[in-house]
Curated annotation (Swiss-Prot):
Superkingdom of this protein's organism: Eukaryota
Location of the region described as Disordered in the Swiss-Prot/TrEMBL record: 1-47, 142-380, 409-428, 463-504, 654-759
Compositionally biased region (Low complexity): 1-36, 142-211, 221-347, 463-495, 660-747
Compositional bias of kind Polar residues: 348-360
Protein's name in the database: Putative uncharacterized protein DDB_G0279653
Length: 759
């Protein structure tokens, strides 16, 4: 009790109103819906001993947590029902008002509907009344008409009777007159009677002659009517038939004119579309001089129009002419209809020309596609790949050799050509259809199963072969093959434009870059068919994904390959012919001193020849999923001691700027990039050769078309060892403009990642 007295003294001294309020609440257990505190563990003797703290619950359940304490002793927490809100009545009134308003609105709507129905009924009644009135009027008019007709008939009958009476009276009068005349004639002399008899006989004879003349006249009229009607009808029928024939001829002529106009306009539009899409290939489609240095003025005009009128093609990023097809891979989801040939001409481009109403950007989205009827590629085809199946898309690459309509069979690469891997090329023959590409690491988890999947494995060489997959008459100026420009083979042959389906698509972010070694030695006499799938799981992050590739070379132990996704390396893929250099990262060279392998060691476990001394000169060539990685021609990847490297200008313009360009302004920005390339081409060729659709060979003609320079690659070796990409060709200062602007470290984020393989 002493403690209670102390508490009461404190309350009296401090005038604690809160305790009084709590008092009232507890005394009046029914007030404000509070529960009676008789069920608590600690029962107070006086109700003023309690302090109440109220907390809201976290969830939206009803009630609050109430903490009641006796002095400083916390009894327990208890869930009590939530007190009614002060504005509950107001809310109820609002709800009532809203309900009343809704009811009133419903009633008004019902009343309006009823009124509308009543109005409709009234209108229907009025219409019925009007119809009844009209029917009554019609009946009255009919009655009047009948009455008038009856009166008219009666009048006619009366007139007819009157006429008959008059005729009878006249007949009676005539009879009387005749009787009088007869009496007078009888009173004449007998001599006169004789004369009358003679005159009567003559009169009868004249009557007999007069009636046959009338009959003949009637028959003549009838025959004239028949003879006049039927020939006229026949003539009219013939004239009508001739008019119908004339109208049919006019219709046929109009149809022929329209068909000719449609055909001409169709071909014209398709050619214009082709010129817009394919730039330098259109006007020389029937010649073998597509890749001459001095292009025709028509060709240049088309290219100028393409660069100056890109708004025609810049409808949307997806409908632009293959400059920016999709951020995803073009091998999976692009659907296109096969082209239909317009005419039977020998032009290879009309096989791929399409109507203006259809989409202009058709099969060039797919690097595998060719001209001619072909079924639509589906996503399932990606998983049906087999390297030796006849249904493979690689067989399309060989069709040029077997095509009877192919006028230039120099594209048919055999194993003894300059392109074959036996002779040091990149391998465009049938032996090198087994191919490999490194994995796509962008936007993927670092699982080692994705490293060397066969789905992506077939993409790199298809793109390489796509460069050889040219049309019929559009192949080479000379008799050499497309990619025969090796390190020692700059014999003045111009590298032609790549295939239309192949060059105009920009690479997506997910497409890998494969490092391939160009080896000019005839060391690779055998490509075994063993498939490589040795996998090695590693907990390393995605930036450095280590995997093992089993080497086919003897008893060498397995070594790791390092995928450096943070690198800034960009390479050139112009002639597939970059001179011999080693691109070795500094950490890789310091740690293991390893060397980059050749492409033959990666392609299906290809055995490396015994001449290991030449493996040091194996130059890496960066081959992406698209030929648009092509930079300045014959520009070398320099030896670097760090993981930074200067951009090549064309690679910058064609690839890297896509990550900085919005979709809407893509074409305009891309035209500016192409104009940078065109300055070099204008200086080289004195022509306005413009690249609308990333024609990489136009930017590569800076060094490819230098027919007078036979030491291009040697100069590249000297310059690339000094980290100078300026002097690409000693005799071609104009082509160096592509690289002068790129010695700065423009370290933009690359679209695709280089994968460095440590041999």
């Amino acid at each position: 009790m002493s403690s209670n007295n102390n508490f009461d003294n404190n309350k009296n001294n401090n005038n604690n109103n809160n305790s009084n309020q709590n008092n009232n609440n507890i005394d009046n257990g029914g007030n404000n819906n509070e529960t009676n505190p008789t069920t608590w563990k600690f029962k107070a003797q006086t109700p003023t001993d309690f302090n109440i703290t109220v907390r809201k619950r976290r969830n939206s359940e009803p009630g609050v947590l109430v903490q009641r304490s006796y002095k400083n002793y916390v009894t327990h927490w208890k869930l009590e029902t939530k007190k009614p809100t002060k504005y509950k009545d107001a809310k109820e009134e609002r709800l009532r008002q809203q309900a009343q308003q809704q009811q009133q609105a419903q009633q008004q709507a019902q009343q309006q509907q009823q009124q509308a129905q009543q109005q409709q009924q009234q209108q229907q009644q009025q219409q019925q009344q009007q119809q009844q009135q009209q029917q009554a009027q019609q009946q009255a008019q009919q009655q009047q008409n009948q009455h008038q007709q009856n009166q008219h008939q009666q009048n006619q009958h009366q007139q007819h009777q009157q006429n008959q009476n008059q005729n009878q009276n006249q007949n009676q009068n005539q009879n009387q007159n005749q009787n009088q005349n007869q009496n007078q004639n009888q009173n004449q002399n007998q001599n006169q009677n004789q004369n009358q008899n003679q005159s009567q006989n003559q009169h009868l004879h004249q009557l007999n002659q007069h009636h046959p003349i009338q009959h003949q006249h009637h028959s003549n009229n009838h025959s004239n009517n028949h003879s006049n009607n039927h020939p006229n009808q026949q003539q009219n029928h013939q004239q009508n038939h001739q008019q119908n024939q004339y109208s049919q001829q006019n219709y046929q002529q109009q149809n022929q004119g329209q068909n000719n106009y449609n055909n001409n306009s169709f071909q014209g539009n398709s050619n214009n579309n082709y010129n817009n899409g394919y730039n330098n290939n259109s006007n020389n489609s029937n010649n073998n001089n597509n890749n001459n240095n001095n292009n025709n003025n028509n060709n240049n005009n088309n290219n100028n129009n393409n660069n100056n009128n890109n708004n025609k093609n810049s409808i949307s990023p997806t409908s632009s002419p293959l400059l920016f097809p999709s951020p995803s891979s073009a091998f999976t989801s692009i659907k296109s209809t096969p082209p239909k040939s317009i005419s039977g001409s020998s032009s290879p481009f009309q096989d791929q020309a399409r109507s203006p109403s259809s989409s202009f950007f058709h099969d060039r989205d797919l690097p595998f596609s060719r001209g001619g009827a072909q079924r639509k590629p589906s996503i399932g085809d990606e998983f049906k790949f087999h390297p030796y199946s006849l249904n493979n898309k690689v067989t399309n690459l060989i069709d040029n050799c077997n095509n009877s309509n192919n006028n230039n069979n120099n594209n048919c690469t055999e194993s003894n050509d300059d392109d074959s891997p036996l002779n040091g090329g990149l391998g465009y023959s049938r032996l090198s259809q087994r191919r490999i590409s490194l994995p796509i690491l962008a936007n993927r988890p670092p699982s080692p199963e994705r490293s060397l999947s066969p789905i992506h494995e077939r993409n790199s060489l298809n793109i390489i072969n796509g460069f050889n997959k040219n049309n019929n008459n559009n192949n080479n100026n000379n008799n050499n093959n497309n990619n025969s420009n090796n390190n020692n083979n700059n014999n003045g042959n111009n590298n032609p434009l790549p295939h239309i389906n192949f060059e105009n698509r920009r690479p997506s972010r997910e497409e890998p870059i494969v490092i391939i070694n160009n080896n000019n030695d005839n060391n690779y006499n055998k490509i075994p068919s063993q498939h490589m799938h040795d996998k090695k799981s590693s907990p390393t992050p995605r930036s450095i994904l280590k995997q093992t590739i089993s080497k086919y070379h003897g008893n060498e132990c397995e070594e790791e390959e390092e995928y450096n996704t943070n690198s800034n390396y960009y390479g050139d893929n112009d002639n597939r012919n970059i001179s011999n250099q080693n691109l070795v990262a500094s950490n890789a060279s310091q740690s293991s001193g390893s060397k980059l392998p050749s492409i033959q060691s990666l392609l299906n476990d290809v055995s490396i020849s015994d001449n290991k001394s030449k493996s040091n000169s194996n130059s890496p060539t960066i081959i992406g999923m698209n030929n648009n990685f092509v930079g300045g021609a014959n520009e070398n990847i320099s030896k670097l001691s760090s993981i930074t490297m200067n951009h090549h200008s064309n690679f910058n313009n064609l690839v890297d700027d896509n990550s900085h360009i919005s979709n809407n302004n893509y074409n305009n920005h891309h035209n500016n990039n192409n104009n940078n390339n065109n300055n070099t081409n204008n200086n080289n060729h004195n022509n306005n050769i413009n690249n609308n659709n990333n024609n990489n060979n136009n930017s590569n003609n800076n060094s490819n078309n230098n027919n007078n320079n036979s030491n291009n690659n040697n100069n590249n070796n000297n310059n690339s060892s000094n980290n100078n990409n300026n002097n690409n060709n000693n005799n071609n200062n104009n082509s160096n403009n592509n690289n002068n602007n790129n010695n700065d470290n423009n370290n933009r984020s690359p679209r695709n990642m280089l994968f460095y393989l440590n041999k």
